[in-house]
UniProtKB/Swiss-Prot annotation:
Recorded family membership: Belongs to the heat shock protein 70 family.
Keywords from the UniProt entry: ATP-binding, Chaperone, Nucleotide-binding, Phosphoprotein, Stress response
The protein's role, per its UniProt record: Acts as a chaperone.
Domain of life, source organism: Bacteria
Biased composition (Acidic residues): 628-642
PANTHER family: HEAT SHOCK PROTEIN 70KDA
Pfam families, alphabetized: HSP70 (PF00012)
Annotated stretches, region: Disordered: 615-642
Stimuli inducing this protein: By stress conditions e.g. heat shock.
InterPro entries membership: ATPase_NBD (IPR043129), Chaperone_DnaK (IPR012725), Heat_shock_70_CS (IPR018181), HSP70_C_sf (IPR029048), HSP70_peptide-bd_sf (IPR029047), Hsp_70_fam (IPR013126)
Descriptive protein name: Chaperone protein DnaK
Length: 642
C-alpha cells in the first residue's frame, strides 16, 4: 500500500507532508520551498504554471492568473459573498456556470470550475510527493476550513479526484493543527483553543486532548468561524489605502488599471509581511502609471500603527466566533489551557496581542503556523493507513441538520457540534388520509422556522399503501460520514421501500448564510420559541378537529343531531382560530372542542366495552403508533390529487 499524503490546500499557500516512520515531515517543492502559492496561471502559449512561477508573472498576466480560488469553491455565482467580496477583489473573470455555480474564465473565454483550478495545485503537490518518495501516490488527506459546508467539502473532494487523488478523508484545519500539536504533547489532559487565521478563512475550534487507555484522544468540543475573513482581506485593506493615497497625490485612480492593481496588490502583501517585524516600511512602485504629463511613481511610507488601524476591525471580527465556540463548548476562557495560532496571518503582532487579551494567556509560539495543518493531515493519513495506532480523532459537524415538518417547522435530527461520523433516525408519518407519497425537505441551520434555514435538497418517497393519516411509519435517517458529508434516506417501514439522497454541491451554503443563520437564531431565540409554541398549538388543534369529525362520522346514528351540530360548531370556531396568530385563542377553542366532545367519547367508549363483552372479551388489536412519531407536513407529489 502506498503512502497517504497530507495536503493543506490553502487560499494563499498550500503545504505537503508525509509520514516518515513515526514522524510527519513537510516536503519541499521543486523550487526548494516548504509552501507553494495556491496560484495557477494559463499562458498565451498554452502552458499551465502553478505556484511561485504563476505568482511571478501575475503582474503581466492578471486576466489569466487565478488566486484565492478556494473562496469560490462550492459556491453559487449569485451568492452575495461572491458578488461583493470576490468579483470586486480579483482581476480575473468570475462567471455564472450553467448549474448556477461560480466559475472562472480566461480572457480567451475558457471556462473552468474552481475544483479544476484547485486540482492544478493538488497535482503539483502529488508530483512533489512522488518525486520525493520515488513511487506513485494515489491517496491523500486534504484539509478544509472547519466552517466549510457540505457543498464546499464535496467540491474539495472533486478537486482531489480531478488531480488523480483518492481523498481518503477531509479533515478540518484546526483539528489537523491540534493533531500535529497533540502528537508531540505529553502533558496529559488539555483543553486547547486553535485560532486559525489563514489567507482566506478563519476558524476557531475548542479541542480536548486526553490520554484514554494509552491512546491520544483528540476530541473537538465546538467549532465556529468565518469563511470570508483572512490574510487576503488584510492585503486588500492596505492595497485600497495605497490606491487612495496615490489618488490624493496624483489624481489618478488605479482601480481601473489591472496591471497597476496587481503590482499594488503584491506590494501590499510584501509590506504586510515586513510590518510584522518592522515598525515602518516604504512601498515604492516606480512607473506605476502615466498621464499626459509623464510617468507616475508610487512611493508611500506605511507605519505599523497605520496598518493596524486599517485592519483592526478585521481582527476584532475574529473574536466573535471565539465567544460562540466557547459558549457551544460550555466553557469559560479560564478553562482553556493552551492557545495555538495557525495560519500565516497570525504572525501579525496585533493578532497575537488581541488573542492574548481575549483568552488571557500567551499563545504558543512553538507551532509552525504555515505547516501545522499539513503535518496534522499527514498524521491522519498515517492513522488511516494503519501506520499510526495510538491516536483517536473525534471531529464535529458545524451546523444543525433536519427536515421540514408540519406547520413549517424545522425538526432537527443532528444538532450542531455533534461528533462525527454520526447516524440518527427518527420516525415521521403522513399528514393526510391515504397519502400516496411524501416529500423529504432537508434543511441546514439553527432556526425553528424551516423557511429561515438553508434548503439542501428534496426527494420523494412514493407508493405508500393507503392508510389513515399518522399510521404509515416513515423512518428518516441522516448519516454524516467522517468527511462531514451528508446522506439522507427515507424508508416506509411497512413496505421496506427506501429512497435516499447524497447532498450535492449544487446546494451549497455561503459563509454569510451560515453566519446569518447562527446570528439570527441567537437574536431571534424568543421569536422562534413563540413561533414553535404557536405551531404546536395549531398542530394539536388540527389533530383534534380531524379526530373529532372522523369519530362523529364513524358513530353515525349513535350521535344526536344536536350533538353533531355542537361538535361541528366547535370545530369551525377552532379552525378559524388556527388561521390567526393568537396562541391563547387556539388553546381556548381547543379546550372548548375537547369539552364538547368528551360526553360523546365517553358514550362511544361505553358502547365499545359492551361490544367487547358481547364478543366474549375478545380484544381488538390496533396498530400501535411509535411514541416518537412526529406529524410531518409532507407534500403530496401525486399530480391529480385534489
Amino acid at each position: 500500500m502506498g503512502k497517504i499524503i497530507g495536503i493543506d490546500l490553502g487560499t494563499t499557500n498550500s503545504c505537503l507532508a508525509i509520514m516518515d516512520g513515526k514522524t510527519a515531515k513537510v516536503i519541499e517543492n521543486a523550487e526548494g520551498h516548504r509552501t507553494t502559492p495556491s496560484v495557477v496561471a494559463y499562458t498565451d502559449s498554452g502552458e499551465i504554471l502553478v505556484g511561485q512561477a504563476a505568482k511571478r508573472q501575475a503582474v503581466t498576466n492578471p486576466d489569466n492568473t487565478f488566486f484565492a480560488i478556494k473562496r469560490l469553491i462550492g459556491r453559487k455565482y449569485d451568492d452575495k459573498a461572491v458578488q461583493e467580496d470576490i468579483k470586486k477583489k480579483v482581476p480575473y473573470a468570475v462567471i455564472k456556470a450553467d448549474n448556477g455555480d461560480a466559475w472562472v474564465a480566461t480572457k480567451e473565454g475558457k471556462k473552468m470550475a474552481p475544483p479544476q483550478v484547485s486540482a492544478e495545485v493538488l497535482r503539483k503537490m502529488k508530483k512533489t510527493a512522488e518525486d520525493y518518495l520515488g513511487e506513485p501516490v494515489t491517496e491523500a488527506v486534504i484539509t478544509v476550513p472547519a466552517y466549510f459546508n457540505d457543498s464546499q467539502r464535496q467540491a474539495t473532494k472533486d478537486a482531489g479526484k480531478i488531480a488523480g487523488l483518492e481523498v481518503k478523508r477531509i479533515i478540518n484545519e484546526p483539528t489537523a493543527a491540534a493533531l500535529a500539536y497533540g502528537v508531540d504533547s505529553k502533558k496529559g489532559e488539555q483543553t486547547v483553543a486553535v485560532y486559525d487565521l489563514g489567507g482566506g478563512t478563519f476558524d476557531i475550534s475548542i479541542i480536548e486532548i486526553a490520554d484514554v487507555d494509552g491512546d491520544n484522544q483528540i476530541e473537538v468540543l465546538s467549532t465556529n468561524g468565518d469563511t470570508f475573513l483572512g490574510g487576503e482581506d488584510f492585503d486588500l485593506a492596505l492595497m485600497n489605502y495605497l490606491i487612495d493615497e496615490f489618488k490624493k497625490e496624483q489624481g489618478i485612480d488605479l482601480h481601473n488599471d489591472k496591471l497597476a492593481l496587481q503590482r499594488v496588490r503584491e506590494a501590499a502583501e510584501k509590506a504586510k509581511v515586513e510590518l510584522s517585524s518592522a515598525q515602518q516600511t516604504d512601498v515604492n512602485l516606480p512607473y506605476i502609471t502615466a498621464d499626459a504629463t509623464g510617468p507616475k511613481h508610487l512611493n508611500i511610507k506605511v507605519t505599523r500603527a497605520k496598518f493596524e488601524s486599517l485592519v483592526s476591525d478585521l481582527v476584532m471580527r475574529s473574536l466573535e466566533p471565539c465567544k460562540k465556540a466557547l459558549e457551544d463548548a460550555g466553557l469559560s476562557k479560564s478553562d482553556i489551557t493552551e492557545v495555538l495560532l495557525v495560519g500565516g496571518q497570525t504572525r501579525m503582532p496585533l493578532v497575537q496581542e488581541k488573542v492574548k487579551e481575549f483568552f488571557g494567556k500567551e499563545p504558543r509560539k512553538d507551532v509552525n503556523p504555515d505547516e501545522a495543518v499539513a503535518v496534522g493531515a499527514a498524521i491522519q493519513g498515517g492513522v488511516l493507513a494503519g501506520d499510526v495506532k495510538d491516536i483517536l480523532l473525534l471531529d464535529v459537524t458545524p451546523l444543525s441538520l433536519g427536515i421540514e415538518t408540519m406547520g413549517g417547522v424545522m425538526t432537527k435530527l443532528i444538532e450542531r457540534n455533534t461528533t462525527i461520523p454520526t447516524k440518527k433516525s427518527q420516525v415521521f408519518s403522513t399528514a393526510e388520509d391515504n397519502q400516496p407519497a411524501v416529500t423529504i425537505h432537508v434543511l441546514q441551520g439553527e432556526r425553528e422556522m424551516a423557511s429561515a434555514n438553508k434548503s439542501l435538497g428534496r426527494f420523494d418517497l412514493a407508493d405508500i399503501p393507503p392508510a389513515p393519516r399518522g399510521m404509515p411509519q416513515i423512518e428518516v435517517t441522516f448519516d454524516i460520514d467522517a468527511n462531514g458529508i451528508l446522506n439522507v434516506s427515507a424508508k416506509d417501514k411497512a413496505t421496506g421501500k427506501e429512497q435516499n439522497i447524497v447532498i450535492k454541491s449544487s446546494s451549497g451554503l455561503s459563509e454569510e448564510d451560515i453566519e446569518k443563520m447562527v446570528q439570527d437564531a441567537e437574536a431571534n431565540a424568543e421569536a422562534d420559541k413563540k413561533f414553535h409554541d404557536l405551531v404546536t398549538a395549531r398542530n394539536t388543534a388540527d389533530n383534534l378537529i380531524h379526530s373529532s369529525r372522523k369519530a362523529i362520522q364513524e358513530l353515525g346514528d349513535k350521535v344526536t343531531a344536536a350533538e353533531k351540530e355542537k361538535i361541528e360548531e366547535a370545530c369551525k370556531e377552532l379552525e378559524a382560530a388556527t388561521k390567526g396568530d393568537d396562541k391563547q385563542a387556539i388553546e381556548s377553542k381547543t379546550k372548548a372542542l375537547e369539552e364538547a366532545f368528551a360526553p360523546i367519547a365517553q358514550k362511544a367508549y361505553a358502547e365499545q366495552a359492551q361490544a367487547a363483552v358481547a364478543q366474549g372479551g375478545a380484544k381488538a388489536e390496533e396498530p400501535k403508533k411509535e411514541e416518537d412519531v412526529v406529524d410531518a407536513d409532507f407534500e403530496d407529489v401525486e399530480d391529480d390529487k385534489k
